[in-house]
């Protein structure tokens, strides 16, 4: 019988995280990696929902962005802390047998174990990759080639797992379902389990829920909606992080200027204003950017790709956020309200710029003369005074301008009709 002793101190993500080295990650197949990714993001969402202030773990950022989740050696001190408590008695048994933690895990199981839950109200469960699960009478039975483990799931948490029966039927938590009539597109993988194959990339999934979540990566579907502003997100963890914006909480402080930000990602991007760091460089034109999202939007200028089209005016956009803000011009929606004066605005960016009127903040400073501005575009236009750049050229007379506004006013001189002389 597996029992969990709940701790009284606040739960952190490290309490429910498992780390892999590069070699260990390479030994996992696609199904195991997908399961690991879903479990870690779910655990992070559960921890984040407890409202304890903490920085988004590097592991979570890697998983959300589709990066390889390794780089920290789990057998270093931090990794050992994250793995400690995977199974009560494992650490003591390891010392008794004279094995290193790494040797112990490799000998104990044929593959890696994940910790699911670990929070009050859920029982920590150890899932052996490649195992099949059954749930008779409130108990989980984990089948492996070497042993069976039993423990009680007091939270009645359900996980789907499928096992072939007589070549035609499989069990879904004890329910027999015909493969031929209900799951005609499914495949049987080498381990003998029913799996779902992605038609886009060929990946297999044992759980239908995991398969449907994976499909959203190809379709771009975002099923988690913010009730405050209507914005959609692909993962619940991203929604939770976004909702902090509406609460007004800004727990992350910039040490340079003291500005508070709602997320650690926003803090990192903000700090690049002070450092001037621009790690994302365009290979087409050499232009560098401090934000990866802005960099991706810029690349679409070279490719001409515009994925979003407005049904009202048929204008197209290369960026989903610009498309969303544009649609509010037609609907009149202004979901962002200034707490100082009550003015409502159509985008979070417009709200941030507006709030600088009240705070007097001018975060964009010219390195040539030290003059500061409250908008980045104003700084860019100002810098042309020093560089002499005039990117706006009149096709009628060839005159050039450094400011877009002056260029537009000049064009009107050519479009105005000349009065007819008597």
Curated annotation (Swiss-Prot):
The keyword Secreted does not apply. It comes from the Eukaryota. Keywords: DNA-binding, Metal-binding, Nucleus, Repeat, Transcription, Transcription regulation, Zinc, Zinc-finger. Pfam families: KRAB, zf-C2H2, zf-H2C2_2. Signal peptide: none annotated. Disulfide bonds: none annotated. One of its GO terms (biological process) is regulation of transcription by RNA polymerase II. May be involved in transcriptional regulation. PANTHER family: ZINC FINGER PROTEIN, ZINC FINGER PROTEIN 771. This is Zinc finger protein 620. It comes from Homo sapiens (Human). The lineage of its organism: Eukaryota, Metazoa, Chordata, Craniata, Vertebrata.
């Amino acid at each position: 019988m597996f029992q969990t002793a709940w701790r009284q101190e606040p739960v952190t993500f490290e309490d429910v995280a498992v780390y892999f080295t590069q070699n260990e990650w390479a030994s996992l197949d696609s199904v195991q990696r997908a399961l690991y990714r879903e479990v870690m993001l779910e655990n992070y969402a559960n921890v984040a929902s407890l409202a304890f202030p903490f920085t988004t773990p590097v592991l979570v950022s890697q998983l959300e962005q589709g990066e390889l989740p390794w780089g920290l050696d789990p057998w270093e001190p931090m990794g050992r802390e994250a793995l400690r408590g995977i199974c009560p008695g494992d650490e003591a048994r390891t010392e008794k047998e004279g094995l290193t933690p790494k040797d112990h895990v490799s000998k104990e199981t044929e593959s890696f174990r994940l910790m699911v839950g670990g929070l009050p109200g859920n029982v920590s469960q150890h899932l052996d990759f490649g195992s099949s699960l059954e749930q008779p009478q409130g108990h989980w039975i984990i089948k492996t080639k070497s042993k069976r483990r039993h423990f009680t799931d007091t939270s009645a948490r359900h996980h789907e797992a499928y096992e072939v029966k007589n070549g035609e039927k499989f069990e879904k938590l004890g329910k027999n379902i015909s493969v031929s009539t209900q799951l005609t597109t499914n495949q049987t993988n080498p381990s003998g389990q029913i799996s779902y194959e992605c038609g886009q990339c060929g990946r297999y999934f044992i759980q239908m829920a995991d398969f449907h979540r994976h499909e959203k990566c190809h379709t771009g579907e975002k099923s988690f909606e913010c009730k405050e502003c209507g914005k959609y997100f692909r993962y619940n963890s991203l929604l939770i992080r976004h909702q902090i914006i509406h609460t007004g909480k800004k727990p992350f402080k910039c040490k340079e200027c003291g500005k508070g930000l709602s997320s650690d990602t926003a803090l990192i991007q903000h700090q690049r204003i002070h450092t001037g760091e621009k790690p994302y460089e365009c290979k087409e034109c050499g232009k560098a950017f401090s934000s990866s999202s802005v960099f991706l939007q810029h690349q679409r200028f070279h490719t001409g790709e515009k994925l979003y089209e407005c049904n009202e005016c048929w204008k197209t956009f290369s960026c989903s956020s610009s498309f969303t803000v544009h649609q509010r011009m037609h609907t009149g929606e202004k979901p962002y309200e200034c707490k100082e004066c009550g003015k409502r605005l159509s985008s979070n960016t417009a709200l941030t710029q507006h709030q600088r009127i009240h705070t007097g903040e001018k975060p964009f400073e010219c390195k040539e003369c030290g003059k500061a501005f409250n908008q980045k575009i104003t700084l860019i236009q100002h810098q042309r005074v020093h560089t002499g750049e005039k990117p706006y050229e009149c096709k009628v007379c060839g005159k050039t301008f450094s400011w877009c506004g002056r260029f537009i006013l000049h064009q009107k001189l050519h479009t105005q009709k000349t009065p007819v002389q008597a």
